[in-house]
């Protein structure tokens, strides 16, 4: 019987499952190198944690690792039901809040190593978390593609830690009771991008689709389709970072000004940025709440022990 220790949290409704122990050793390389080892040699541990019957399509996993740098608080590898994520904003907020719950950190500034670089996270006295993300930038503006059933769609391609296609003029109602229609639309857009061979820089797969709409109480409301056809319950940290990159490029948001980004279910991140060479460095602030501590049991005789569909 294999045992995996986990602590669950949610950030604005979006769950994060922190794996504390039970995964095989991945060596002492960078988080990117360890992610590659995990994907190549031990991927069934990801599926056991995230796929049914223990997980769900919406859950994001975060493997807690010893950091490379001595001044880093932790290393982390993010994954979901379809594979691995370079960075995860809501997940980082959840990880930092959980590290405090574990007694490993106190309020202050902490460095967290991820596969796409080291991010700075501030745990505030009220236990909210600000994440100073990796640099974000807009790769392409006003990209038009034809989407069967919907016609021409125009959007921007931006990097915020993952690759996004951001659409403001879409004709869809961004609301919690319209998720099925939003998912169908965003999925069709993603398929259209793949069919047209449209990518991020260096052929990076655009695996996140983000739709924006006006919000009566905040600066914007968004719907984010993540890899694997799950939608983000939170405003999406990397997606908000990509949005800030586009706003900055258009001259619509000045450095240091707070942008209030609501999610499709109404949870909110507060975001701002500072300028950097060729782009911006976003900071995302939100709150996470602890929801469970558990030991996952994997019986080798269980036909679904490593996840349904694994």
Swiss-Prot record:
Source superkingdom: Bacteria
Record key words, sorted: Isomerase
Residues the record marks as active site: 88, 236
Catalyzed reaction equations: trans-4-hydroxy-L-proline = cis-4-hydroxy-D-proline
Keyword flag Lipid metabolism: no
Cross-referenced InterPro entries: Pro_racemase_fam (IPR008794)
Tagged with keyword Disulfide bond: no
A Pfam family: Pro_racemase
GO molecular function list: 4-hydroxyproline epimerase activity
EC number: 5.1.1.8
Residue numbers binding substrate: 89-90, 208, 232, 237-238
UniProt function note: Allows intracellular utilization of 4-hydroxyproline, one of the major constituents of host collagen, by converting 4-hydroxy-L-proline to 4-hydroxy-D-proline, which can be further metabolized by intracellular 4-hydroxy-D-proline oxidases.
Homology family: Belongs to the proline racemase family.
Subunit record text: Homodimer.
Name this protein carries in UniProt: 4-hydroxyproline epimerase
